[in-house]
From Swiss-Prot:
This is 3-isopropylmalate dehydratase large subunit 2. Disulfide bonds: none annotated. It comes from the Bacteria. SUPFAM superfamilies: Aconitase iron-sulfur domain. Catalyzes the isomerization between 2-isopropylmalate and 3-isopropylmalate, via the formation of 2-isopropylmaleate. The lineage of its organism: Bacteria, Bacillati, Actinomycetota, Rubrobacteria, Rubrobacterales.
Length: 424
């Protein structure tokens, strides 16, 4: 029976020889991940199961990132618990100054390779699909079961094929591609399905752009998003990952729930206006929208590519006096690379604040939350009411070029009005 890529990965990690969308199967985990919010809850559930030790310490990673650095005594206690539990279990732990945002550090440190199945205590575990892996976000009770037994139940999802044709133009980034997809199928259009990204446009994307695309598959309601592994993947993993992997692809005659085409040649920078990732317009249609804060970072767009794009706009310019600009490298490695390239100097000279790697304000935790009546434009992945602070604030989503241009202008503008042509 022909299968899609996602179906192949799930079946290969189960005890069944074949399965179809809608079937419920038990799936083995290659890696289980949790953070300072989801981890301690999962530990309590695991203890209630009467299980004292994880199924395999080499396949478990814990990351303190949501409230890093700790914003108060309660968040400090969560991080203390995460570290002490990790030490007791002998699992790898990323703490302050030693990692960054979970979905960035696990990729850049070679934990993720094509063909894996990853269960994560975070909804954006779908990010790992950028490397041809099946990453799915689970609740803390299911994560507890994964920690204890190394498996979880999964209803086999159907697959929506998303074909990117052509090539992206100036000031267009991975964020725009996934916003275009969400605008097309809707925020619930991917329910009970996987988004599989294919086509010449997909193949031409850098790994950082693929991470941005896969990261927001869940914003379309999808189980995950996935790119077939290729030479771009192989080059990225060279000297990062030491485990063997073999590329897998969907069968030519595999069955899809739906097929969608996005023409990159005609795609321009986009903005998701409040209060939904599906409320998407061209940046030209949002021109003139006043901005109080710009936030560039997060697990979807805090890579070195995003920081380079930000620097192209900010270099030689100043942040508007009525705007707060916050820039958050997604990992210590990204931060150090930005320092070595002189990007941090560009940001500081422009009047921006540079933060340690953290989830921070993205989920309304700390370090840049919004007050009532304020509006932000951000490279993060969600803009629901109350997502970044006050429920009476507004959040717009965009790529780093667009966000940085708004920081300079004090309002949403086309990046070309600030910088004539991107260098990279």
């Amino acid at each position: 029976m022909p299968h899609t890529l996602a179906e192949k990965l799930l079946i290969s990690h189960s005890e069944v020889d074949d399965a179809s969308p809608g079937d419920i199967i038990m799936v083995r985990c290659d890696l289980v991940m949790a953070n300072d919010v989801s981890g301690p809850v999962a530990f309590r559930q695991m203890e209630r199961m009467g299980v004292q030790r994880v199924f395999d310490p080499s396949k478990v990673v814990m990351v303190s990132d949501h409230f890093m650095p700790a914003k108060d005594a309660r968040s400090a206690a969560l991080q203390k618990r995460l570290k002490s539990w990790s030490d007791l279990q002998g699992v790898y732990y990323y703490g302050q100054g030693r990692g960054g945002i979970e979905h960035t550090v696990l990729v850049e440190d070679g934990w993720i390779v094509p063909g894996m199945v990853i269960a994560g205590g975070d909804s954006h575990t779908c990010t790992y699909g950028a490397l041809g892996a099946f990453g799915t976000g689970l609740g803390s009770t299911d994560i507890a079961a994964c920690l204890a037994f190394g498996e979880f139940w999964q209803q086999v999802p159907g697959t929506i094929q998303v074909e990117f044709t052509g090539h992206k133009g100036s000031f267009v980034a991975g964020k725009d591609l996934i916003l275009a997809v969400i605008a097309d199928i809707g925020v619930g259009g991917g329910a009970n399905a996987v988004l599989e990204f294919v086509g010449e446009g997909a193949a031409s994307l850098s790994l950082d752009d693929r991470l941005a695309v896969a990261n927001m598959a869940v914003e379309a309601g999808a189980e995950t998003g996935i790119f077939p592994a290729d030479e771009v993947t192989a080059r990225y993993l060279d000297r990062r990952a030491d485990r063997e992997w073999h590329p897998e692809r969907s069968d030519p005659d595999a069955s899809y729930v739906r097929k969608v085409k996005i023409d990159l040649n005609s795609l321009e920078p986009l903005v998701a206006l409040p209060h939904s990732p599906g409320n998407v317009v061209a940046v030209s249609e949002a021109r003139g929208t006043k901005i109080d804060q710009v936030y560039i970072g997060n697990c979807s767009n805090g890579t070195i590519t995003d920081l380079r794009q930000t620097a192209e706009i900010l270099r030689g310019n100043r942040v508007h006096p009525d705007v707060r600009a916050i820039i958050v490298p997604a990992s210590q490695k990204v931060y150090r690379q930005a320092i070595s390239e002189g990007l941090i100097d560009v940001f500081v000279e422009a009047g921006a604040v540079v933060s340690t790697p953290t989830c921070g304000a993205c989920f309304g935790g700390h370090m840049g939350v919004l007050a009532e009546g304020e509006r932000a434009i951000t490279t993060t992945n969600r803009n629901f009411k109350g997502r970044m602070g006050s429920p009476l604030a507004e959040v717009c989503l965009a790529n780093a070029y667009v966000a940085a241009a708004a920081a300079v202008a004090g309002e949403i503008v086309e990046p070309a009005s600030i910088c004539s042509e991107p260098v990279r």
